[in-house]
């Protein structure tokens, strides 16, 4: 499974961009294209959608945005174009609407019917409630870690070993919970937890864990 492409954005249109990587150009449709600038080097998380007639690559600014896109298109009647339209309203805004069971506001998004909005909330409300909770916990842990580093600078005798140990345990628990929500099996999750290296960016931590699972021979079909 290819998770992202890294390259230079050489062209940008209303709803797609062209990413150059090792001499090849990739046409990628993205939500909220204003976040991407021409001539910048950028990591873009990708999803390749293929049917009997076409193969289209969609791109995202973060791995979490990619996950949300996949969840949306898993709903019958919601295609990639509708999912991209929904993401144009903002990823966190969309997550908050789902978590809050606000299908009425969700249904105001272009191309998204009331029936589909209700189904999205029904399927994913609990998941994104937990996503928000995990994000909140991770932010608190990051703030705590920053405070601890400041203490180290101000007082070389400060002993925060126990606090750091607790932080690692909480991060592992949040990572395990996130991988479960993504549909990975307990054996795969346990394997990733033993192999993944610490990373202050939780999204990068998720990405690295998925890479480990994807590259492990014992989990390949």
Curated annotation (Swiss-Prot):
Gene3D superfamilies: 5' to 3' exonuclease, C-terminal subdomain, Nucleic acid-binding proteins. One of its GO terms (molecular function) is ATP binding. The keyword Hydrolase does not apply. One of its GO terms (biological process) is DNA repair. Transmembrane segments: none annotated. The keyword Protein biosynthesis does not apply. Residues 140-166 are annotated as: Flexible linker. It is found in: Cytoplasm. GO terms for cellular component: cytoplasm; Holliday junction helicase complex; Holliday junction resolvase complex. Residues 146-155 have a biased composition (Basic and acidic residues). It holds the Pfam family RuvA_C. Its main location: cytoplasm. Residues 167-221 are annotated as: Domain III. Residues 62-139 are annotated as: Domain II. Keywords: Cytoplasm, DNA damage, DNA recombination, DNA repair, DNA-binding. SUPFAM superfamilies: RuvA domain 2-like. Residues 133-155 are annotated as: Disordered. Residues 1-61 are annotated as: Domain I. The RuvA-RuvB-RuvC complex processes Holliday junction (HJ) DNA during genetic recombination and DNA repair, while the RuvA-RuvB complex plays an important role in the rescue of blocked DNA replication forks via replication fork reversal (RFR). RuvA specifically binds to HJ cruciform DNA, conferring on it an open structure. The RuvB hexamer acts as an ATP-dependent pump, pulling dsDNA into and through the RuvAB complex. HJ branch migration allows RuvC to scan DNA until it finds its consensus sequence, where it cleaves and resolves the cruciform DNA. Homotetramer. Forms an RuvA(8)-RuvB(12)-Holliday junction (HJ) complex. HJ DNA is sandwiched between 2 RuvA tetramers; dsDNA enters through RuvA and exits via RuvB. An RuvB hexamer assembles on each DNA strand where it exits the tetramer. Each RuvB hexamer is contacted by two RuvA subunits (via domain III) on 2 adjacent RuvB subunits; this complex drives branch migration. In the full resolvosome a probable DNA-RuvA(4)-RuvB(12)-RuvC(2) complex forms which resolves the HJ. Belongs to the RuvA family. Has three domains with a flexible linker between the domains II and III and assumes an 'L' shape. Domain III is highly mobile and contacts RuvB. This is Holliday junction branch migration complex subunit RuvA.
């Amino acid at each position: 499974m290819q998770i992202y492409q890294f390259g230079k954005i050489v062209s940008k249109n209303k709803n797609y961009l062209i990413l150059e990587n090792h001499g090849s150009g990739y046409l990628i449709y993205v939500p909220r294209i204003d976040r991407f600038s021409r001539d910048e080097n950028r990591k873009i998380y990708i999803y390749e959608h293929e049917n009997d007639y076409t193969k289209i690559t969609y791109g995202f600014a973060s791995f979490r945005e990619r996950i949300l896109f996949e969840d949306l298109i898993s709903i019958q009647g919601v295609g990639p174009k509708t999912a991209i339209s929904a993401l144009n309203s903002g990823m966190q805004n969309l997550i908050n609407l789902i978590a809050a069971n606000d299908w009425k506001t969700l249904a105001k998004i272009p191309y998204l019917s009331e029936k589909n909005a209700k189904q999205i909330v029904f399927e994913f409300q609990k998941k994104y409630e937990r996503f928000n909770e995990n994000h909140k916990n991770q932010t608190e842990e990051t703030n705590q870690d920053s405070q601890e580093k400041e203490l180290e600078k101000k007082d070389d005798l400060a002993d925060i070993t126990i606090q750091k140990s607790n932080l690692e345990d909480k991060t592992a628990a949040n990572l395990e919970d996130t991988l479960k929500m993504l549909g990975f099996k307990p054996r795969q999750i346990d394997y990733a937890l033993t192999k993944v290296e610490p990373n202050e960016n939780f999204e990068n931590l998720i990405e690295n864990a998925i890479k480990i699972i994807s590259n492990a021979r014992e989990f390949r079909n």
